[in-house]
């Protein structure tokens, strides 16, 4: 399969005369790889794409090694949607449904009484967790509010998810006033107004350079080398089997008997099956 140039890449850029920074990311193969083992309804698939883009954009703002997890928790038809991304732009995601969903549902109808939880976990250092009310029409708007409240940084997020030329695609822009205090509200609003004119087909089809020229051809924009984005689950036989180590030997024996001597555990993210017989479990316990 051939993908658009600049897909599965994240670009950072700087407006040199405006003290505003930006990011752009587009996911195609990464998004497809995430969906391959799942048959999510379209509305859930698109929301998952939006969350993946948001996670990539947020991890690119990290000043340290670590990862960010963004999850929706609710009591509506969509019980859980979780995305985890690292500073190296490796990402994984999953969704759990507990009722029927329909493509014309709003975010509120899909999630019910829900919250958005952001967990920032440095490789070295303490974890930070923020909880955001899902009281806006889109995930992007909820996250913009989060940046204003927690970081005191004016931020614009434009995120789209759907299909382009018959393939799943998700893409987005982040625009943020520089945290050093040198940026002005007027400059930010000027650039945000230009960014808001972007069309879905431009986000999904143009290269980063062409997209930024289309939006900001009168600005001086410095584009930095891109970072590759990829789906990476990180599951393993040992990790999947760790849950079995919490079960008593008698219970494991009963489960093995009920399942013909082998326990099948499937990873929720990538769909990989791990099979555990008595010998495999004994090795895990050794």
From Swiss-Prot:
Disulfide-bonded cysteines: 233-235, 267-270
Family membership noted in the UniProt record: Belongs to the HSP33 family.
Record keywords, A-Z: Chaperone, Cytoplasm, Disulfide bond, Redox-active center, Stress response, Zinc
Presence of the UniProt keyword Chaperone in the record: yes
Location relative to the cell: Cytoplasm
Keyword Disulfide bond among record annotations: yes
Protein name: 33 kDa chaperonin
GO CC annotation terms, alphabetical: cytoplasm
Gene assigned in the entry: hslO
GO terms classed as biological process: protein refolding
């Amino acid at each position: 399969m051939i993908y658009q140039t600049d897909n599965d890449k994240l670009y950072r850029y700087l407006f040199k005369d405006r003290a505003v920074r930006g990011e752009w990311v587009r996911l195609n193969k990464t998004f497809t790889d995430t969906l391959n083992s799942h048959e999510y309804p379209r509305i859930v698939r698109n929301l998952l794409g939006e969350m993946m883009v948001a996670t990539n954009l947020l991890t690119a703002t990290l000043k340290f090694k670590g990862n960010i997890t963004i999850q929706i928790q609710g009591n509506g038809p969509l019980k859980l949607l979780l995305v985890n991304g690292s500073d190296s732009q490796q990402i994984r995601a999953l969704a759990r449904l507990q009722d029927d969903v329909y493509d014309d549902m709003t975010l509120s109808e899909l999630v019910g009484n829900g919250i958005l939880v952001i967990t920032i976990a440095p490789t070295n250092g303490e974890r930070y967790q923020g909880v955001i009310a899902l009281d806006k029409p889109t995930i992007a708007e909820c996250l913009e509010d989060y940046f204003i409240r927690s970081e005191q940084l004016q931020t614009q997020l434009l995120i789209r998810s759907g299909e382009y030329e018959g393939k799943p695609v998700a893409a987005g822009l982040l625009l943020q006033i520089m945290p050093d205090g040198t940026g002005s509200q007027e400059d930010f609003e000027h650039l945000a107004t230009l960014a808001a004119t972007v069309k879905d087909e431009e986000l999904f089809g143009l290269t980063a350079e062409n997209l930024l020229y289309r939006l900001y051809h009168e600005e001086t924009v410095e584009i930095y080398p891109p970072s590759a984005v990829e789906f990476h689950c990180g599951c393993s036989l040992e990790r999947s089997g760790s849950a079995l180590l919490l079960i008593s030997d008698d219970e494991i024996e009963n489960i093995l008997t009920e399942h013909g001597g082998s326990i099948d555990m499937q990873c929720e993210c990538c769909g990989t099956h791990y099979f555990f017989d008595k010998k495999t479990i004994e090795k895990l316990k050794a």
